[in-house]
């Protein structure tokens, strides 16, 4: 009986956040539409804002909030039921969902862990070297695992936790600073960088690509994204552990046993399994098609479908695995709602209206100054978001429109905001899916997490806008 009551409490609606969400939506709804904007666009904006607030305050799970938003959109006649459900037929959504399924193969077969242990075995003799081995393990995995939460939480975090405890570093006995705190903070921050480096390294990156095309007419392909990100990304991966090593140094500087631990783990895993070989083949197939498929008119979502079909055919994944992948189905629901809302806000003129309104506010500045101001505002506004996807859905289109309207080259603006959309999770312990996993281990106090995150945010902005800017100049992006 007690357990049933506890379960009921856990699943209960949070009344105060729900009332706030509904109240904000109603207030915006009944405010007269601004001049130059259709009432229908304003009403959809009210639903959109309420949805974002619901995602942040979480009176219900995100999927449930999305269903509520869909119901209100259709019931009020703001959009037809066909338009309301149009997001579920979006190929970008299905690329994300299918990629979730493929990432399950890395975890289920143990291939992801094996790759990481090999890196530790080769490069993990010192604590700093160990941190680099973990980051570059993440880098290798990132193009094929679009859920940075699955990549960091399902592969990198367990390895760090195991290594930390092996070296006697645990918050339970007050030894978290030995090695665990440093590795966890470095692993988390590195995950954000690798997420920024590839179109397929974070679930919302394909959404960004779609918004960039819809708003600015920019096509962000897998290859163009990776080439633009490679230099600032690698520089960030090199600098970040050094900064954390200086700000929050580990007590253990040498880790001669790390390679031995990795070797033992690899022995426990045994020889390369048939399922792992199948996973490698699919990984390479998908990666090659994501890079070169455009030359053969093979869409990225088609590539993902091919990869999933092969995994099912080879029984690396079963249909039960697919059904049990709750994160994928949850993502399908709330991503579909967000994409639909964002699409029709653009179609109904909301984004262009906001762009024109904001353009006047930065009209006195050169495009470079306006560009920097808007990038910084976009980055630090993430303190108010508990989800990168929610932030991207709420602000990416509008900020891109304003930056382009101010005179910035569209490709430069789209890419810069895209990269920042991954990096801004560095600031808090709730700003990305992986953050609660790493912070929740208890190795790093909140104040230290935030202070290091803020310093690293400055480092990220400098690296990506200055070093990245020079690289993009070489590439002819601006």
From Swiss-Prot:
Compartments where located: Cell membrane
Protein name, UniProt field: Putative malate transporter YflS
GO molecular function: transmembrane transporter activity
NCBIfam families: dass
Principal subcellular localisation of the protein: membrane
Stimuli inducing this protein: Expression is induced by the two-component regulatory system MalK/MalR in response to malate. The regulator MalR binds to the promoter region of yflS.
Protein function: Might be a malate transporter.
InterPro entries xrefs: CitT-rel (IPR030676), SLC13A/DASS (IPR001898)
Top-level lineage group: Bacteria
GO cellular component: plasma membrane
Membrane topology, as annotated: Multi-pass membrane protein
Recorded family membership: Belongs to the SLC13A/DASS transporter (TC 2.A.47) family. DIT1 subfamily.
Signal peptide: none
Keywords recorded for this protein, A-Z: Cell membrane, Membrane, Transmembrane, Transmembrane helix, Transport
Membrane-spanning parts: 12-31, 41-57, 64-81, 96-118, 187-209, 222-244, 277-296, 300-319, 332-354, 364-386, 398-420, 450-472
PANTHER family xrefs: DICARBOXYLATE TRANSPORTER 2.1, CHLOROPLASTIC
Pfam families registered for this protein in UniProt: Na_sulph_symp
